[in-house]
Every structure is written in structure tokens, then in C-alpha cells.
């Protein structure tokens, strides 16, 4: 059996950036992280975490937040009961119903937020992770998050229009 997910990069529009992936049902969150990295073309150069922080009900004072990440990157700000080891926690234990969602943040500096939605199970014995559908090019690493990416797209659109625009493009390339 395999788990099927739609992973959508949030706060990036025109075009939307999303991937549909399938992974074996025994995958841990660390393995899901690797599958997402490959599907989006990220280079796995930064820290990551899964959590409910971006999606939990902030109007409900009893809503708990949690973090699933590598143990060596556990923050002192996070209480022990809120932290889970991504190499030990199986995705299938957390996302059990069609439509269940979790937030995946890659690069805690640029803060690329992805919504991971569980689409259901597939009855197949294909091995490994697979990207089966998608849309939109993934932003480049270290471009400054959503705001930096918006600036980069503007620079690219204007690069040939004036000397100042060409200089701005060159400055970005040199950075």
C-alpha cells in the first residue's frame, strides 16, 4: 500500500506550485521530507519541520501545536511533549483520513511553507517515492522566501528593459 499526497507551496501565486506524490505507507516524516525535496527540486540544504502551526485552529485555545523534525534540531523553545523525532514518526500514524493536512516548512530562514494534504491510499507495490503530477516551477534556493521570489520574478521580467534593470539583474546574479 502507498500513501498519496498533494503538496502545495503556500504564498506563491501565478502560477501555483504543487506536486502530487506517492510514498510507501511505512515512510517516516524524514523520508517524506526527502520525497518532497526531490519532487520540488529543492537541494536539501536547509532545516525542515512538519507541524500544525500554519493550519491548526488558532481561535481554539485548546488547540495544541506540535513539531516533527530531526532530534538534533529540537528548539529549546519547544516543550518536550510538543516535539517528535521525524526519523521515528511514521506519516501513516499522523495522517489517517482523506483530507488530513499538515504543514511542512523547508528552510527556516526563507520559510517556504507547504501544505501537505493526504489524498488516500493506493493499492500498489511500487517501491520508493514518486512524483505523479504537478504544476509550476519551484523557486530557487536562497532567493529570500516569498518576497524575495516575487522580487526575483520582477527583476527577470524587467531585465532587458533598461540599463538600471540590467544592473539589478546582474546584482542579483552576483549575489
What do the PLM-derived regions correspond to, one by one?
Residues 1-175:
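Short linear regulatory motifs enriched in tryptophan with gly/pro/ser
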Amino acid at each position: 500500500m502507498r500513501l498519496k499526497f498533494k503538496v502545495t507551496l503556500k504564498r506563491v501565486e501565478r502560477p501555483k506550485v504543487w506536486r502530487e506524490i506517492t510514498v510507501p505507507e511505512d515512510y517516516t516524516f524524514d523520508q517524506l521530507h526527502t520525497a518532497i525535496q526531490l519532487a520540488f527540486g529543492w537541494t536539501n540544504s536547509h532545516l525542515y519541520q512538519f507541524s500544525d502551526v500554519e493550519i491548526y485552529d488558532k481561535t481554539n485555545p485548546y488547540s495544541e501545536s506540535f513539531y516533527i523534525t530531526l532530534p538534533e534540531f529540537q528548539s529549546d523553545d519547544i516543550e518536550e511533549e510538543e516535539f517528535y523525532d521525524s526519523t521515528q514518526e511514521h506519516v501513516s500514524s499522523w495522517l489517517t483520513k482523506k483530507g488530513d493536512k499538515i504543514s511542512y516548512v523547508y528552510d527556516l530562514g526563507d520559510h517556504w511553507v507547504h501544505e501537505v494534504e493526504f489524498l488516500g491510499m493506493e493499492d500498489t507495490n511500487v517501491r520508493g517515492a514518486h512524483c505523479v503530477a504537478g504544476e509550476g516551477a519551484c523557486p530557487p534556493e536562497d532567493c529570500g522566501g516569498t518576497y524575495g521570489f516575487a522580487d526575483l520574478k520582477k527583476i527577470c521580467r524587467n531585465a532587458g528593459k533598461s540599463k538600471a534593470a540590467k544592473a539589478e539583474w546582474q546584482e542579483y546574479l552576483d549575489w
